[in-house]
Amino acid sequence: MLKEEDKIFTNLHGQQSHDLKSSKKRGDWDNTKALLDKGREFIIEEVKKSGLRGRGGAGFSTGMKWSFMPKNSAKPCYLVVNADESEPGTCKDRDILRFEPHKLIEGCLLASFAIGANDCYIYIRGEFYNEASNIQRALDEAYKDGLIGKNACGSGFDCNIYLHRGAGAYICGEETALLESLEGKKGMPRLKPPFPAGFGLYGCPTTINNVESIAVVPTILRRGASWFASIGKPNNTGTKIFCISGHVNKPCNVEEAMGISLKELIEKYAGGVRGGWDNLKAIIPGGSSVPLLPKSLCEVDMDFDSLRTAGSGLGTGGIIVMDKSTDIIYAIARLSKFYMHESCGQCTPCREGTGWMWRVMMRLVKGNAQKSEIDELLNVTKEIEGHTICALGDAAAWPIQGLIRHFRSEIEERIKGWSSAI
C-alpha cells in the first residue's frame, strides 16, 4: 500500500486550485533549473534507473525510449505528449489534465531537454474541452513566469510547448496515427519501421509519451530513481493511477503502488463490489482492450507481469467491475461495436474482421447461433491479432478471446436456450 508521503499526484481529486501559485506550494517547479543543470544524460539515466515503464498501455521503458533519440540530429527533434485518452473505462489522464496541469508541463520541459527537443506538442482529445482550457491557462502562466519558452527557467534552454486539439478519433491514440493527425492528415497508423525516433513528426526524430509517464518525471528526478524503484515490485516499479468503474459502490481514480492486489484496490478505495465480493462476476483490469478476468482470478496483483501471467494485461489501469447482474456476452459485444466503429479501415483484417466479429457477437447475445460458431469466432480473432499495422486489431480481438476462454459455457447455454425455445 502506498504511503501518503509517496504520492506524486497530491491534487488528483481537485481539492485545491490547479493554478501556478497553488502548484508551486505542492512542490511543482521547485528549482527546476537545478535539474536541467545536471544535463541530459543524467535525466535519461535517472529515468532508466527508476524503472518507469510507459503508463499508456505498452509498458515500454520510458528512459530507454528517450535514449533512442539521436544525440546530434541535423533535423529538429520533437516531444509529443499523447493526451488523446479515449479508451473505454479509462479517465486517469483527464484528471491530470484537469487538476495537475503544471506537473505535466514541467515534465514536458524536462523530457524535451533530455531528448534535445525545443518544441513539444500536447495532443489532447477533442472532447476534453475544459481540460484543454486548463492546460492552456497553465501554459500561459508558465510562459509568463519564464518557466517555459526562451531561456526556460533561466537554464539557457529554449522550450516551446503547444496544445493541439484532436477531432474525436480513437485511432489517433495510436502514436503514428497521432503524428499523421498532428500534421493535418487523416489519422491513420504508419508502417513501422521507420520508427518515430528516426522518422516522426514532419519526418524528424520524435518521442511520443503518455500524459502520466511525463507527469511523474519531475518527482522522480527530485526524489531520486532509487525512491521510485523502491515502490512496487521488481520490473513493475513506482506508482500508478487506477480508474475503478462499473459495479462498485464508489467509482474513483486512485494513485497506488504497482503490484497492489486488485481485490484490495476495489475494497479499500471503491467501497467494494456492489452486493459484496461474492456478487462479482468478472473484471476488465486494464481498459477495454485487455481480456477480462473471471472472479476466480480477480485477486491478482495489479502490475504488468502478474496480469500477463493471468492471461490479461495492465493496459491503462482502467478497472471495469461487472457483478452477476451483467450480461457478460452483451458487455463484450458492446466493446466489439466500439472497435468496429473506431477502425480506420486501412488494414483488411481489422476493417472486415471487426464488423464480422460484432455481427457474430450479437447473434451470440441472442443465442441465435451454432455452437461451432464459437470456435469459428475464436479463430477469426486469432487471424486478426498480430496481422494489422497497429494494435487496434489486437484490442478488438482480446476481449472476445477472454470471453470465450472464461465464459464459453455461458455462451453455449445461451445457444441451447434459444434452440430449445424454437
UniProtKB/Swiss-Prot annotation:
Residues 1-26 are annotated as: Disordered. Its cofactor is FMN; [4Fe-4S] cluster. It comes from the Bacteria. [4Fe-4S] cluster binds at C344, C347, C350, C390. Pfam families: Complex1_51K (PF01512), NADH_4Fe-4S (PF10589), SLBB_2 (PF22461). Keywords: 4Fe-4S, Flavoprotein, FMN, Iron, Iron-sulfur, Metal-binding, NAD, Quinone, Translocase. Binds 1 FMN. Binds 1 [4Fe-4S] cluster. GO terms for molecular function: 4 iron, 4 sulfur cluster binding; FMN binding; metal ion binding; NAD binding; NADH dehydrogenase (ubiquinone) activity; quinone binding. InterPro entries: ComplexI_51kDa_subunit, NADH-UbQ_OxRdtase_51kDa_CS, NADH-UbQ_OxRdtase_suF, Nuo51_FMN-bd, Nuo51_FMN-bd_sf, Nuop51_4Fe4S-bd, Nuop51_4Fe4S-bd_sf, SLBB_dom. Its EC number is 7.1.1.-. It catalyses: a quinone + NADH + 5 H(+)(in) = a quinol + NAD(+) + 4 H(+)(out). Residues 16-26 have a biased composition (Basic and acidic residues). NAD(+) binds at G54, R55, G56, G57, A58, G59, F60, S61, T62, G63. FMN binds at residues 166-213. The keyword Acyltransferase does not apply. Belongs to the complex I 51 kDa subunit family. NDH-1 shuttles electrons from NADH, via FMN and iron-sulfur (Fe-S) centers, to quinones in the respiratory chain. Couples the redox reaction to proton translocation (for every two electrons transferred, four hydrogen ions are translocated across the cytoplasmic membrane), and thus conserves the redox energy in a proton gradient. This is NADH-quinone oxidoreductase subunit F.
